[in-house]
Amino acid sequence: MLRSHLLLVSSFAILHSSFSAQPNVIVILADDLGWSDTTLYGHTAYYQTPNVERLAKRGMTFTRAYSASPLCSPTRSALLTGQSPARTGITVPNCHVPQVVLQATTGKKAPVDQKAIQPDPVTRLKTEYRTLAETLKDAGYATAHFGKWHLGPEPYSPLQQGFDFDLPHHPGPGPAGSFVAPWKFTNFKEKSPGEHIEDRMAAEAVAWMEQTKDKPFYMNYWMFSVHAPFDAKKANIETHRGRIDPKDAQRSPTYAAMIQSMDDAIGTLLDGLDRLKLADNTIII
């Protein structure tokens, strides 16, 4: 689930008047990142996010927002379809369960300590909804999804929802096994011992952008970070362990290391855009 959502819009195209009629679009989504867990809004000194700040300085930030459902799958379905979670029926993060439910129904019961009876939710994003990926693909865009999906396995995967490419093509609620290799993804193996999933995905995303740079593209970079399981690069954990202030409410070295990997991935994407000279024609959300 996503406890809260930091929305940054970095439109290099907005800051520079020379952009094409079809700018590239990248949507970056962190998972379970608390709004106070970046340095952007001045609520933490322990968790360090220089690349989030770098992105914000090149665009716009939004500090007031309302979420119809501050959870994982509902957020993802809303981003892709423009429909509220109540309309899609995806109101809880359960799109990884085996049962295929395509129509929400009225709930019949609830625990005695619960004040309301919730509807029985949908467990897949129905392919009848027109997604942002399908719309942009029809407009001539190359489309790719990197990272967490959590809107259903085949036949409801990114490949059936308008995306040409999907990596690591994993329907689960978190990384398969762990963030640090060895992983348990079915068809996605590490290139080196101890490889971090965000490092690998960011590198693969930049490689895909390079292959696609002569065509407008829409790319989802939907991180597994910083959702459970709570593990990270050991060296980074030890670095942050040495920075703990026992009086600070934020003092988890493992979580700090997870945020660092998230931020590093954003930096890799930004560096790639600059190197490929795509930044001035790319909108990042």
Please name every model-derived segment.
Residues M1-A21:
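Short, basic, low-complexity termini and linkers enriched in Ser/Thr/Gly/Pro
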